[in-house]
Amino acid sequence: MTKLTVKDLFEKKGKVKLTELYVTNALEAHAAERAGIDIQIVSFKKETLRTGVPTNRWFRDAHIKDIREAAPNTFMIYGLGQLSSPDKAIDAALIARDNGADAVYCGNSPKYIEALRNEGLPAVSHIGLVPYKSTWTGGFKAVGKDAESAFKVYQ
């Protein structure tokens, strides 16, 4: 299995179906890679470690590295979580990249994505079903299905 690049993703868009899976640990990442999953979404949640000890940046960094080591040939997108500023998103994305992530998922506003792009950091986000914004959209439902309504969601 050859690891995808951002360039590959752009070239395959609309032409090739890719598989994507959320993994929580190195065992899942390894199994997913062996199964041929193209893209893995990873995030750091202290409950996924189940260590019973306080977690900090060292644990997060080790978590990303463990998953990268377990799945060296899979495109990894690391979920940044909710951050308080575009600068903090850049800092977190640089740390994720330095620990093995190929891109980051950032669910914040477009100005965060723009800041990441301006720094050359590949970022993924979406408009549509955004669970943490369900109170704004009237529940868990897909929104922005056409260009006009998508632009309203974007605004």
Locate each region found by the language model.
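Short secondary-structure boundary/capping elements
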Residues: 1, 24, 55-63, 84-88, ...
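Short, conserved beta-strand segments within well-ordered enzyme catalytic domains
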Residues: 20-22, 39-41, 75-79
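Conserved anion-binding
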Residues: 73-77, 83-155
